[in-house]
Amino acid sequence: MLILVSPAKTLDFEQPPLTQTHTRPDFLAYSQELIQVCQRLTPSDIATLMKVSDNIAGLNAARFGEWTPDYSIDNAKQAIFAFRGDVYTGFDADTLTPEQLERTQSQLRILSGLYGLLRPLDLILPYRLEMGTALANPKGKNLYDFWGNTLTEAVNNAVAAQGDDIIINLASNEYFKAIKRKQLAGQLITPVFKDFKNGQYKVISFFAKKARGMMARYIIDQQVSSIEELKAFDVAGYYYSEELSKPNEPTFLREAQ
């Protein structure tokens, strides 16, 4: 069972990681190509392209300028400990045991605009480059063009290494669009999380993101290996709804918080 998640805008490069163990991203040569494109952008270009404030644009212009492919644990941090958004709050990597971290390294993959596909212990530098960014590059008009079939092939290879064909998609639509769905060599399962609000169950972004992280952690903790076992997910008040689920979209509901 392979789990796909999105990265996060919020980063933490201050707190020491849980372990010194690390790996090197598989697609650093691709990342270098993108960085070379980004280094030609002015802070004003970045502000317009990424729709961010001047301060954030300036910060990222500096990050692009300082980027280096020479990674070590001294100047970089493992992705699973560096990302600090809602998904990662739900996953809570800082409480993983060594055995759980080993399973996470095997089963979890993080889609990334800059790095393509990351393993949890792959070292990264601080960056911001969302997959939906319309960054013109030598391969096309955006990052979907840039990554092409590369990430789909990488996911297929990672699935094959799991020994089964189940892919749990806990990534956002923006990031999963980088995967060619029809070329996936596996059974794609996309869980849906709905909370009760104003008289109906609906997807609420903040809660859904955190739930994706909690489900990823549940799969690791419980060593889930089948869709039936996944339906037992009951963290933070969520429960499986047979009525609202579709074959490849198991739906989990939660009452008002």
From Swiss-Prot:
InterPro entries: YaaA. One of its GO terms (cellular component) is cytosol. GO terms for biological process: response to hydroperoxide. HAMAP family: UPF0246. Belongs to the UPF0246 family. This is UPF0246 protein Shewana3_3143.
